[in-house]
Each structure stands twice: as structure tokens, then as C-alpha cells.
């Protein structure tokens, strides 16, 4: 689970 710069979860 990675967190993007815009608070998006993958």
C-alpha cells in the first residue's frame, strides 16, 4: 500500500 502525494492509496 503506497501513499501518493495527493493522498491516493494504491
Swiss-Prot record:
Annotated keywords: Pyrrolidone carboxylic acid, Secreted
UniProt-recorded name of the protein: Tachykinin-like peptide-VIII
UniProt GO cellular component terms: extracellular region
Cysteine pairings via disulfide bonds: none
Family stated for the protein in its record: Belongs to the tachykinin family.
UniProt tissue specificity: Expressed by the venom gland.
Organism from which the protein derives: Phoneutria nigriventer (Brazilian armed spider)
Superkingdom as given in the UniProt entry: Eukaryota
Pyrrolidone carboxylic acid modified-residue sites: 1
Cellular localisation: Secreted
Broad class of where this protein is predominantly found: secreted
